[in-house]
Design a protein with these regions (language model features):
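Alpha-helical scaffold domains
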Residues: 1-168
Length: 168
């Protein structure tokens, strides 16, 4: 089904650490130049595109960070597997919104699209690490009854991360 879990994914078996080391070599390419990789049917190509953005993000100025964030959110249809979300959402979406209005997180959670919903909750891992739990708890409450196990697992994971840090 269109937009379904791993729809049309082809795996070639490249380990994540290898993909990550390749990504670091392309930290200075224009963010737009990785879009063909993000559109590829091969899962590891899409992962490489996202890991390039993840590697670029901390080295980027405000303008470039906004471009990466905007490209990420306008291509969520290609970020369609749990590992693609989990290895990128908090480092791009979470980091970008850290000192901004978090409304985009709530829009993603309400989108009805599985992967955008997972992006919304996983992005809050950035804030959990800084002992800011409000967004996570709000989104967890909204998504807790989600019918898909991939959302339930992400919510459980983030709540567990909150529990590790909130000893109150």
């Amino acid at each position: 089904a269109k937009g379904a879990y791993g729809e049309g994914d082809k795996f070639v078996g490249i380990p994540v650490p290898k993909t990550r080391s390749v990504a670091k070599q392309y930290v200075y390419v224009a963010p737009e130049d990785v879009l063909p990789l993000l559109s590829d049917a091969v899962h590891e190509c899409r992962l490489l595109a996202l890991l390039i953005w993840v590697a670029q993000f901390p080295k980027s100025d405000k303008l470039r960070r906004k471009r990466i964030f905007d490209l990420y959110l306008s291509n969520t249809d290609k970020i369609n597997n749990w590992d693609l979300v989990d290895l990128s959402a908090y480092q791009i979406v979470g980091e970008y919104l850290r000192d901004k209005d978090h409304t985009p997180l709530y829009r993603l959670a309400e989108s009805g699209y599985l992967w955008e919903q997972r992006i919304s909750i996983v992005a809050t891992w950035k804030y959990i690490r800084e002992k800011q739990f409000e967004d996570t708890l709000y989104l967890a409450d909204k998504l807790l009854q989600h019918p898909h196990d991939l959302i339930q697992k992400a919510v459980g994971w983030m709540l567990r991360e909150v529990g590790k840090r909130d000893k109150a």
